From Swiss-Prot:
Motif (CXXC): 46-49, 278-281
Catalytic activity, reaction form: Catalyzes the rearrangement of -S-S- bonds in proteins
Lineage: Eukaryota, Metazoa, Chordata, Craniata, Vertebrata
Entries under SMART domains matching the protein: EGF, EGF_CA, FU
Record's GO cellular component terms: collagen-containing extracellular matrix; glutamatergic synapse; membrane
A molecular-function term among this protein's GO annotations: protein disulfide isomerase activity
Residues in compartment: Cytoplasmic: 384
Role: Protein disulfide isomerase. Promotes the localization of acetylcholine receptors (AChRs) to the plasma membrane.
Annotated disease: Atrioventricular septal defect 2: A congenital heart malformation characterized by a common atrioventricular junction coexisting with deficient atrioventricular septation. The complete form involves underdevelopment of the lower part of the atrial septum and the upper part of the ventricular septum; the valve itself is also shared. A less severe form, known as ostium primum atrial septal defect, is characterized by separate atrioventricular valvar orifices despite a common junction. Jeffries-Lakhani neurodevelopmental syndrome: An autosomal recessive neurodevelopmental disorder characterized by developmental delay, early-onset epilepsy, and hypotonia apparent from infancy. Clinical features include motor delay, speech delay, and impaired intellectual development. About half of patients are non-ambulatory and/or non-verbal. Some patients have cardiac rhythm disturbances, and some experience recurrent infections. Premature death due to cardiac arrhythmia or epilepsy may occur.
Induction notes from the record: Up-regulated by inducers of the unfolded protein response (UPR), including tunicamycin and thapsigargin.
Protein name per Swiss-Prot or TrEMBL: Protein disulfide isomerase CRELD1
Annotated phenotype, changing residue 192 to Y: In JELANS; pathogenic
Signal peptide: 1-29
Gene: CRELD1
One GO biological process term: cardiac septum development
């Protein structure tokens, strides 16, 4: 790691220049690497195989369309019979089956290319469905529709209408999954053949079931009206065929903390925090306190803040009291600041000059740089033959020489005295 810059103007300038010339630059200026994102989920092998077959079938359509259709029917029929099942066509189709970025498709095609060739030349007459022959029967990656799992078991509800047509059989068509039915809203049961909680049978026949919603708080009902409730949801009680809200705040059902109060809601309740002034409360605000918190006092029916600053609570010179909600704090008076537990008068700092932090050696270097620039400029003008600038140049050189000699003699004398 590069060192931090030294103090002082000139050393800092030289440090920055050295960093600029000594590449690469300081490492803290390099951008941090982007956060690592989790890899996307891999598709089920059956889905990859289905995609490969779908792309293969599209390739068959494309090759027929691209190679024939010129209008000469007799010529097309003669040549189509040769091209239809040719190796040339197979190669053309396979070249476009997988996109460049679909790694899973390329991997599966590499593993199954010999099987595809076998089907193309020997099996497609007896097994025209490539998906069934390749993905289900040969590779055993997929199952027929309405079945699931390693043994291709029927989904609940049967293979014709898995999950009764009102849900999704988990793993259907693949060699995985549990076969569990994920039912649509309003439907339930093992094969989604019943109405779920909060719904009733509006219509049913041998092949059709319609489930409609009960009235809001009803868990079970015989119809859509409030009076059709048979059982109520949690937080409600059945009373004269209607569901009535239970006030949990008036029962032991509410479980709020010591510094909270209960608020009843439809079918439930909420616990809300007491006011800061309260130690326990029966409702919102400082007027519903059971007891007052420290720093508060009972005034009428409310717990109000005690102004501790009315008494002498901040001993010490130049201190003053500041009242806060439920307490107070001692601060230094204006024009004073805290230092080691006492308040001392603030010293207004003198305004620092531009060169106030530079050392004597740094000032000498800066002066020499400045005079050097001036002399170079004057020398350039004097070289053009201007007598005025020539005189100024000679005078500046003489002045600089005298100044430098006097400064050097003072330093030599000072060093001699100090024994350097």
């Amino acid at each position: 790691m590069a060192p931090w810059p030294p103090k002082g103007l000139v050393p800092a300038m030289l440090w920055g220049l050295s960093l600029f010339l000594n590449l690469p630059g300081p490492i803290w200026l390099q951008p941090s690497p982007p956060p690592q994102s989790s890899p996307p989920p891999q598709p089920h092998p059956c889905h990859t195989c289905r995609g490969l077959v779908d792309s293969f079938n599209k390739g068959l359509e494309r090759t027929i369309r691209d190679n024939f259709g010129g209008g000469n029917t007799a010529w097309e029929e003669e040549n189509l019979s040769k091209y239809k099942d040719s190796e040339t066509r197979l190669v053309e189709v396979l070249e476009g089956v997988c996109s460049k970025s679909d790694f899973e498709c390329h991997r599966l095609l590499e593993l199954s290319e010999e099987l595809v060739e076998s089907w193309w030349f020997h099996k497609q007459q007896e097994a025209p469905d490539l998906f069934q022959w390749l993905c289900s029967d040969s590779l055993k990656l997929c199952c027929p529709a309405g079945t699931f799992g390693p043994s291709c078991l029927p989904c609940p509800g049967g293979t014709e209408r898995p999950c009764g047509g009102y849900g999704q059989c988990e793993g259907e068509g693949t060699r995985g999954g549990s076969g569990h039915c994920d039912c649509q809203a309003g439907y339930g049961g093992e094969a989604c053949g019943q109405c779920g909680l909060g719904y009733f049978e509006a219509e049913r026949n041998a092949s059709h079931l319609v489930c409609s919603a009960c009235f809001g708080p009803c868990a079970r009902c015989s119809g859509p009206e409030e009076s059709n409730c048979l059982q109520c949801k949690k937080g409600w009680a059945l009373h004269h065929l209607k569901c009535v809200d239970i006030d949990e705040c008036g029962t032991e059902g509410a479980n709020c903390g010591a510094d909270q109060f209960c608020v009843n809601t439809e079918g439930s309740y909420e616990c809300r925090d007491c006011a800061k002034a309260c130690l326990g409360c029966m409702g919102a605000g400082p007027g519903r306190c059971k007891k007052c918190s420290p720093g508060y006092q009972q005034v009428g029916s409310k717990c109000l803040d005690v102004d501790e600053c009315e008494t002498e609570v901040c001993p010490g010179e130049n201190k003053q009291c500041e009242n806060t909600e439920g307490g107070y704090r001692c601060i230094c008076a204006e024009g004073y600041k805290q230092m080691e537990g006492i308040c001392v008068k603030e010293q207004i700092p003198e305004s620092a000059g531009f060169f106030s932090e530079m050392t004597e050696d740094e000032l000498v270097v800066l002066q020499q740089m400045f005079f050097g620039i001036i002399i170079c400029a004057l020398a350039t003008l004097a070289a053009k033959g201007d007598l005025v600038f020539t005189a100024i140049f000679i005078g500046a050189v003489a002045a600089m020489t005298g100044y430098w000699l006097s400064e050097r003699s003072d330093r030599v004398l000072e060093g001699f005295i100090k024994g350097r």
